[in-house]
Amino acid sequence: DQIRATFGGRRITASSPQGRFADGAARINGSVLTDCFAVGKQMFAAFDNGLWLRVHLGIYGAWDFWGEVTAVDYSAGVPSVTLPGAEPAADSAPLVERVGDSGRIGQTGEYAAANRMHTVAQIVDADGEDSALSIGAPRRRRMAEHDTELATSEQWPPEIVGTVRLRMLTDRSCADLRGPTVCELLDDAGVERVLDRLGPDPLVGDPAAGEERFVKNAARRRVPIGQLLMDQAVVAGIGNIYRAEILFRAGIDPHLPGNEVPESKLREMWRDWTQLLPDGVRVGRMMTIDGLTGEQWE
């Protein structure tokens, strides 16, 4: 949402300072970004020349943002994601425009608590750990590498820092992509092929249809359920923390084969996800327990 909100409808100057994506950057250079969405851990950005940018950040990939960044306020709820070819969802999240020196976002599909904050000081904090633009592991390592440069740069366009696979630039916003597992261009058919390989995402599309797909995918496999939940073809984008928590909350042994897990438990897990994941997006944390109280630890 943040890339769509910041760059949507704007003509992009694309380059590959590292050189590994030079041909791809040249093909989208000068195009307008028309849409952007994520399924699981993969991002798909559409351009007006018919090409799609597909990015999978993996473990170490990250986006560094510079200049004017438009974040999304999720405090009132999480909007539905509409896939290509589907009718647009009626709900939406308000955009909150911010201007800051820099920031980071990593791990597509994850959001930070400061998405609902309203001042630059809250967005870019002292160490970046809770910044709306410092999202995804390993945050502290990345922040430690570039804190000085990111915090003090006034040059425009920003100086290239480190290894940048792709830079997307407008007259007021810049995003640098570093270390992704996948960065490629696709046509419409290519996007469909990738989406067809992915399991349902609890944050994307019709939850009821996703539930049926998940139950079917998990129930036919003899693989341990704990392993199945990390298979992106079974369910997209859950991740290790939610996997462990959901299994614990459902009282399911992670070593139990998928085809031995009662259907009622599979459905219980899916419905739990469809509640927990939007909560996590809304508050900017992986929250699996309500009502936690106590003094803040510093």
Located regions from the model:
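Structured catalytic/nucleic-acid-binding cores of DNA maintenance enzymes
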Residues: 1-298
